[in-house]
Amino acid sequence: MHVQRIAAFSHGTNGGNPAGVVLCEALPAAEQMLTIAAEVGYSETVFAAPSEGGWRVRYFAPEIEVPFCGHATIALGAALALAHGDGTFTLQLHDTRITVTGWRNNPALMAALQSPRTRSEPAPPELVEAALGLFSYSVADLDPRLPPAIAEAGARHLVLALTSRQKLAAMHYDLERGRRFMTAAGIVTISLVQAETNTRFHARNPFAAGGVYEDAATGAAAAALAGYLRDVGWPHGGMIDVLQGEDMGMPSRLRAEITSETGASIRVSGAARQI
């Protein structure tokens, strides 16, 4: 089974978050997809097979299946554009339909996804306390303008906004402890962000639940963050840029476009490159 390797949300010819992409006539058994994802070793591998009106899609991390993965969807959009020409493709997830658009902008590949609907709610205080302990942060490190939240756009994320770029750069934690915490909390990643401006955010996304210390680019988390900003009335101006992967030597750029409709899909776009 051929696995394409594509880095999504890349910055020029560098960076981005690598994803495996498998285009097949029919989806393999879940156990086989999990095995392939583990062999590939990226944070996610996406599997897609033609179905009525589009493509049936499933996402696998090395240790678990995840309901949605933004960077793998961007990689899939690029792969579909290469295989079938520029266009918009309908993707059937487990419980919703989304679209991804892929196009060639020589020499670059580009893609944009429309996320599942978004929602957010304040994070329980005990969850926040445990998360701060995991990273050796304190309440004083949190940006009071953006209270801790559970945010969703196809997957659940804990959003913690920090006041300091230096604190974000110094992020560290124990992988096994983080895995237990995220699994028990039912969250896919912890989205650690710092607002440089109202529309420019630095981000790091630990993904211990999937056996990955940190994601270089997390499209689902960017969509969830954008939905959260809309919910709290943040002056986003309709668009934010998320800079991720800088502190791990894999610079990534994600753009999220935000409408005024509460809960509406977020458009997340970026470049992609073949590996």
Segments predicted by a language model, with ranges:
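Anion-binding (especially nucleotide phosphate/pyrophosphate-binding) glycine-rich loop
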Residues: 32-66, 192-201
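Acidic, low-complexity central loop/insert segments
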Residues: 54, 60-182, 230-274
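Glycine-rich, acidic
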Residues: 150, 179-202
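Short beta-strand-to-turn element immediately C-terminal to the catalytic PLP-Schiff-base lysine
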Residues: 21-25, 48-49, 159-162, 193-195, ...
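Conserved loop-to-beta-strand segment in the C-terminal subdomain of adenylate-forming
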Residues: 13-18, 155
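N-terminal, positively charged, Ser/Thr/Ala/Gly-biased leader segments
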Residues: 1-15, 140
